[in-house]
């Protein structure tokens, strides 16, 4: 057999391709092929195509790519670069490129990331740095069109394609003939566009090339999706941390917007991913003072023609806070910044404040609209590269400031995710302004309240002259100032001016205030405190007691019934229940002191209308207090008086005693709300039942006095008894008081009819005034009888009140019956008249026009 040479073998294999394939598949060892193809990208042999590669070779390449993907240390760009190198080799194309898709200012775009990748090119040469990017909107270039349509394109001749742009060819000196382009997507979002340019040894890319291209693009897709998911995770992590920490600091500082912004922005600096950022705070003044307008109106000054915010304010940054994060961290605060400050000179913050737009600029110094400083802005040598500026908008949609962020740390321009995360931050900061605004409003309201209280005190508080009309120290002690007087002398001369309680029947349940002047009632009130022996025991200054009593009298409005006379009567009845009714034995002197004082104050500043009217009319008191509206107002008014040291009759008590007094004031005054009466009367009845079964007085005293709750229940019922006590007075007094009460109710009814456009209930309807006796009987039976009957059981000394109530019921019942009889007669008369009229009408209709007797006047029936 002859020698077989190389040429003969090669010729045989070419003529018998099926044999060659079977032989190589069966005989060629994997180690040999592996040694051929396991080479670095730089050593890849030119011209090796997918056709020339076995499955084993393909597996080796795929394994290598998977190894690169698995290596977490490798960057996304490096892995994609290696994949594109393999594709360049396999597809026999001249080069590959990758464009990254992103959005800025809400506009999508594509930017060069890997350019002109060949099987032997270096990564550093192919990677496009952020400052050298070429950016296309989606309506220019094939890459943009692919990103827009999200479709694969195989273009045999780019010059015949309407979307082709030769901008990059001119910039790089390259000539593009044909290409394949495919989008890399995640869901509906386009992440990148990969392009294969200029098929070698052919005029266009084949169907087989398309399959290979799409096949290996799965690796790039996997890498990009993994990178994008990681990036989104980082974004959300930063967003949550920013919101968490900014919320923490925002709610730490509620007093001042500058401190609030500063604390929040400084705390989250590590999550902002930028080299520097600044916050410009805008002046919130909408209207100039009138004296600032005068020069303009007189023509001495030009009106403002500069930029204004959307709500019409002049754009005026009153402060800039500059946060430097590169190099040594530093914070600069620039109050009243000049117009040529580097933060403002570009005009970008002013533009954002004027229009409220988000501005994202990738190459700021080259921008033609804004004049950014091209060189270093300060001594640190730092220069502006890219900028993201956003308005800070509060809940009223007013722009309160502008936040500007400079130079993303990785050198890339800010993208849509940076916009979103920082917009979330600025929105939160804008909304948090509500906290400081609310705090400021609360402060103003508090200050207004203090001023109003001061004005009220000035008008209500007893003047020195009024105090001197009772406490005549100048006349009797021959001094110019009360400070010169000894307290014992003041007590002595005060007692001399007070009436004798027996002369005025202050100890009697039948006491009437009608013979006494309102000024005289003030001295009577002071006398009651001396009678329960609390003035000297608790060291109440004579001047303070006199001023407080006079001020309480002035605190009552001049209305029909709930005036000072009613207030005094309730205080006198409380005194009588304690002393004459002998209930004082259950209470300490301090408690008795507080109870009488609270009784005097219980209706102070009453408006002449009830709680229901306050709610119907949406009065401020109804908004301030949810329940027992007027009673809580009387309580707050009383406490306000005690806050003034010159009116505080409890000023010499210790802290615990004073707290006890305030608590008793609350229980006593709130208890006058009749809506609470039905809740407490069962409890009071049980106490009375228990007392009746006790054999000795000492046992009863112990049963009540050691239990604060029982004492409070009794005190609450005492306040109800005092408040309604006018109905127990002698008939001559009670009938007059009842008319005053009715008149006040009718006045409220008139208001309901005219102001609220509502029909009042019968008790408040002036047109039903004749029903007053009937209403009084119903009120006595439904409310009053239980109170005084139980008190007469509780202490027989209180029986005169129950007797007075019963006598008055007889009087009202008599008048109610008379009214009923009168109404019955009227109804019967009215009924007769109606029947007569009906009969007359019937006769007229049925008589055929006859006379009154139903007979014809012209015809006689024989």
Curated annotation (Swiss-Prot):
Biased composition (Basic and acidic residues): 830-842
Domain PDEase: 486-819
Gene Ontology cellular component list: plasma membrane
Keywords: Cell membrane, cGMP, cGMP-binding, Hydrolase, Lipoprotein, Membrane, Metal-binding, Methylation, Nucleotide-binding, Prenylation, Repeat, Sensory transduction, Vision
Active-site residues, record numbering mapped to chain: 562 (proton donor)
InterPro entries: GAF, GAF-like_dom_sf, HD/PDEase_dom, PDEase, PDEase_catalytic_dom, PDEase_catalytic_dom_sf, PDEase_CS
Binding site for 3',5'-cyclic GMP: 97, 116, 169-172, 176
An annotated GO BP: visual perception
Catalytic activity reported: 3',5'-cyclic GMP + H2O = GMP + H(+)
Origin superkingdom: Eukaryota
Domain GAF per the UniProt entry, residue ranges: 75-224, 256-433
Cofactor binding remark: Binds 2 divalent metal cations per subunit. Site 1 may preferentially bind zinc ions, while site 2 has a preference for magnesium and/or manganese ions.
Residues involved in a divalent metal cation 2 binding: 603
Family matches, as PROSITE patterns: PDEASE_I_1, PDEASE_I_2
Single annotated GO MF: metal ion binding
Names of the cofactor(s): a divalent metal cation
Residues covalently joined to lipid (S-geranylgeranyl cysteine): 859
Function: As cone-specific cGMP phosphodiesterase, it plays an essential role in light detection and cone phototransduction by rapidly decreasing intracellular levels of cGMP.
Subunit structure: Composed of two alpha' subunits that are associated with 3 smaller proteins of 11, 13, and 15 kDa.
Family: Belongs to the cyclic nucleotide phosphodiesterase family.
Name of the protein in question: Cone cGMP-specific 3',5'-cyclic phosphodiesterase subunit alpha'
Source organism phylogeny: Eukaryota, Metazoa, Chordata, Craniata, Vertebrata
């Amino acid at each position: 057999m002859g020698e077989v040479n190389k040429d003969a073998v090669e010729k045989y294999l070419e003529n018998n391709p099926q044999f060659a394939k079977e032989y190589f598949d069966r005989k060629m060892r994997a180690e040999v092929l592996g040694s051929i193809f396991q080479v670095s990208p730089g050593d890849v042999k030119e011209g090796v195509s997918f056709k020339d590669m076995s499955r084993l070779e393909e597996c080796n390449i795929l394994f290598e790519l998977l190894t690169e993907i698995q290596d977490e240390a490798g960057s996304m760009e490096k892995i994609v670069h290696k994949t594109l190198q393999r594709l360049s080799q396999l597809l026999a194309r001249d080069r590959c490129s990758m464009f990254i898709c992103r959005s800025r200012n809400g506009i999508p775009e594509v930017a060069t990331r890997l350019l002109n990748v060949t099987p032997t090119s270096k990564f550093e040469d192919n990677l496009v740095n952020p400052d050298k990017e070429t950016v296309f909107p989606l309506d220019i270039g094939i890459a943009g069109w692919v990103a827009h349509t999200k479709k694969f394109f195989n273009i045999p001749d780019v010059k015949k394609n309407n979307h082709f742009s030769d901008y990059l060819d001119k910039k790089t000196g390259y000539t593009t003939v044909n290409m394949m382009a495919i989008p890399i997507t995640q869901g509906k979002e386009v992440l990148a566009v990969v392009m294969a340019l200029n098929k070698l040894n052919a005029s266009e890319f084949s169907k087989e090339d398309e399959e290979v291209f799409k096949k290996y693009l799965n690796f790039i897709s996997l890498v990009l999706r993994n990178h994008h998911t990681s990036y989104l995770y980082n974004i959300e992590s930063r967003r949550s941390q920013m919101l968490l920490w900014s919320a923490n600091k925002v709610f730490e500082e509620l007093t001042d917007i500058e401190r609030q912004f500063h604390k929040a922005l400084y705390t989250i600096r590590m999550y902002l991913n930028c080299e520097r950022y600044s916050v410009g705070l805008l002046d919130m003044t909408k209207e100039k003072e009138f004296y600032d307008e005068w020069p303009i109106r007189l023509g001495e000054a030009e009106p403002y023609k500069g930029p204004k915010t959307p709500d019409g304010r002049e754009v005026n940054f009153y402060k800039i806070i500059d946060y430097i994060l590169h190099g040594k961290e530093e914070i600069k605060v620039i109050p009243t910044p000049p117009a040529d400050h580097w933060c403002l000179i570009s005009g970008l913050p002013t533009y954002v404040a004027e229009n409220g737009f988000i501005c994202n600029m990738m190459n700021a110094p080259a921008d033609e609209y804004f004049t950014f400083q091209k060189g270093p802005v300060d001594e640190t040598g730092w220069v502006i590269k890219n900028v993201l500026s956003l308005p800070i908008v509060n809940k009223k949609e007013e722009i309160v400031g502008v936040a500007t962020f400079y130079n993303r740390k990785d050198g890339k321009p800010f993208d849509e995710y940076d916009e979103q995360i920082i917009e979330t931050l600025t929105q939160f900061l804008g909304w948090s302004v509500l906290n400081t605004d609310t705090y400021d409003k609360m402060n103003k309201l508090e200050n207004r309240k203090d001023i109003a209280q001061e004005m009220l005190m000035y008008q209500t508080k007893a003047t020195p002259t009024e105090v001197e009309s009772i406490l005549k120290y100048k006349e009797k002690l021959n001094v110019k100032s009360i400070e010169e007087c000894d307290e014992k002398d003041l007590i002595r001369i005060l007692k001399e001016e007070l009436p004798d309680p027996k002369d005025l029947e202050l100890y009697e349940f039948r006491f009437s205030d009608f013979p006494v002047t309102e000024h005289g009632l003030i001295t009577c009130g002071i006398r009651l405190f001396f009678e329960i022996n609390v003035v000297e025991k608790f060291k109440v200054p004579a001047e303070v007691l006199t001023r407080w009593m006079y001020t309480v009298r002035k605190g009552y409005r001049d209305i029909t019934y709930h005036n000072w006379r009613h207030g005094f009567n309730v205080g006198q009845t409380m005194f009588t229940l304690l002393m004459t009714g002998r209930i004082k034995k259950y209470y300490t002197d301090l408690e008795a002191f507080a109870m009488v004082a609270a009784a005097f104050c219980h209706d102070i500043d009453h408006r002449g209308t009830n709680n229901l009217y306050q709610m119907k009319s949406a009065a401020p008191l109804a908004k301030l207090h949810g329940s027992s509206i007027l009673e809580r107002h009387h309580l707050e008014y009383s406490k306000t008086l005690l806050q003034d040291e010159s009116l505080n009759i409890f000023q010499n008590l210790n802290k615990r005693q004073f707290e006890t007094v305030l608590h008793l004031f609350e229980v006593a005054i709130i208890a006058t709300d009749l809506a609470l009466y039905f809740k407490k009367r069962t409890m009071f009845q049980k106490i009375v039942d228990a007392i009746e079964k006790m054999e000795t007085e000492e046992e009863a005293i112990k049963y009540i006095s050691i239990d604060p709750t029982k004492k409070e229940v009794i005190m609450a019922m005492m306040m109800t008894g005092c408040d309604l006590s006018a109905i127990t007075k002698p008939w001559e007094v009670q009938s007059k008081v009842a008319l005053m009460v009715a008149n006040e109710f009718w006045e409220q009814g008139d208001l309901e009819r005219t102001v609220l456009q509502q029909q009042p209930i019968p008790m408040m309807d002036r047109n039903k005034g004749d029903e007053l006796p009937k209403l009084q009987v119903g009120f006595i039976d439904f409310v009053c009888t239980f109170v005084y009957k139980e008190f007469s059981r509780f202490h027989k000394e209180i029986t005169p009140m129950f007797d007075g109530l019963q006598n008055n019921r007889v009087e009202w019942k008599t008048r109610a019956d008379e009214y009923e009889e009168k109404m019955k007669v009227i109804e019967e008369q009215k009924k007769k008249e109606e029947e007569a009229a009906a009969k007359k009408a019937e006769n007229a209709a049925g008589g055929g026009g006859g006379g009154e007797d139903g007979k014809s006047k012209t015809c006689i029936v024989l």
